[in-house]
Structure formats: C-alpha cells, structure tokens
Swiss-Prot record:
It is a multi-pass membrane protein. Gene3D superfamilies: Cytochrome c oxidase, subunit III, four-helix bundle. It comes from the Bacteria. It comes from Nocardia farcinica (strain IFM 10152). It is found in: Cell membrane. This is Probable cytochrome c oxidase subunit 3.
Length: 203
C-alpha cells in the first residue's frame, strides 16, 4: 500500500493554481484601473489642448528636455514590467523566494525611474521651467507628476508585499496580492510609454 506524501511547497503550488481563474480581487482591480485610465486620458487631453493653443515653439524656451536621460530611465521602467512578471510566475508556482527576488529588483528599477524624474525636475526648475512659468510647464508637471505619484504608490505596494511575505507564511492570498500589484505596475508602465512618446516626440 502506497501513501502519497505532499510537501509544503507542492501544497502551496496546488492552491496557487486556482489563481489562474478570475476572482473578485482581480476583477475589482481591473475595474479600478479602467477608471484610472479615464483619469490619464483626461490628462492627455489637457496636454493636447494646451499644445493646440500654444503659439510658437513647443516646448517654449528656455525649456530643454533631457532626452538622453529620459531614454534610459524609460528603458529601465519598461524592463521592470518584465521583472515584475517574472515575480508573478514565481508566485503562481508557490516560489516565495523567486517572488521576493524579482519584486525587489522591480522595486529598485522603479526607484531608479523616480530618481531620474526628480533629477530632470531639478534641472528644469533650475533653468526656469516651473509649474507656473508657462502653460507647457503646467501640463508637463501635472501629467508627469501624477504619473510619478502612481509609480511611488506602486513602490509602496511592493514594499508592503515584500514585508508581508517575509513575516508570515506564503499563502494564496499573498500570491493574489502579488498578481494584483503586477496589474497596477503594468498599467503604470503602459501609461508612461504614452506620456514619454507624447512629451518627448510630439512637437
């Protein structure tokens, strides 16, 4: 007579497999992100209205956007979507160590993006482009600033998730939380690609 013996890791994996089916948390997150999409659509509309009403150069002098900084910073943020998804794959397998590793890397990459954005803000303000200096300054800081706040919100979510998986046993609920955070992070990345293309290339 044979007795099947299961390991804790395999038990977690079996329970986590159920996460591939839609659940209320995931559906609720997708609905919320849809409302966030409408919010950013309004910001894009504001930017294009300001651009249409502007006379002369866009952006106006003395604004000089730092494309050489923006490109690598953007590349890092886009790459962070891939590291985030690797964390999701680990969570779906019940691999908490892989989840922590990939999400910590994603956290560092997101922090790099925020630091890069802050660096560009510093130089723009130093050169005379502030939120009150022109219509361009207003729409630039409002659109990128709200996106930056969303990135910071994602970083906070990563920190809480990493702490949660460290101080307690890894559960399907934590795996669900990891997947939900990934939805948010992918959304933030996609929004930035649109903002980057609009701000740095639409003249």
């Amino acid at each position: 007579m044979t007795t099947a013996v299961g390991t804790p890791g395999s038990a977690i994996t079996q329970r986590v497999h159920s996460l591939n089916r839609p659940n209320m948390v995931s559906v609720g997150t997708i609905i919320w992100l849809s409302s966030e999409l409408m919010f950013f659509a309004g910001l894009f509309a504001m930017y294009f209205v300001a651009r249409a009403q502007a006379n002369g150069n866009w952006p106006p002098e003395p604004t000089e956007l730092n494309l050489k900084l923006a490109v690598p910073v953007t590349a890092v943020l886009v790459a962070s979507s891939f590291t985030c998804q690797m964390g999701v794959f680990a969570a779906e397998k019940g691999d908490v160590f892989g989840l922590r590793r990939w999400y910590f890397i994603t956290l560092l990459m997101g922090a790099f993006f925020v630091a890069g954005q802050g660096y560009e803000y510093y130089h723009l303000v130093h050169e005379g482009t502030s939120i009150s200096s022109s219509a361009y300054g207003s729409v630039f800081y409002i659109t990128t600033g709200f996106h930056g706040l969303h990135v910071i919100g994602g970083l906070i979510a990563f920190v809480f998730l990493l702490i949660r998986t460290k101080v307690s046993k890894f559960t399907p609920a934590q795996a669900t939380a990891a997947i939900v955070v990934s939805y948010y992070w992918h959304f933030v990345d996609i929004v930035w690609i649109g903002l980057f293309a609009t701000i740095y290339f639409v003249r």
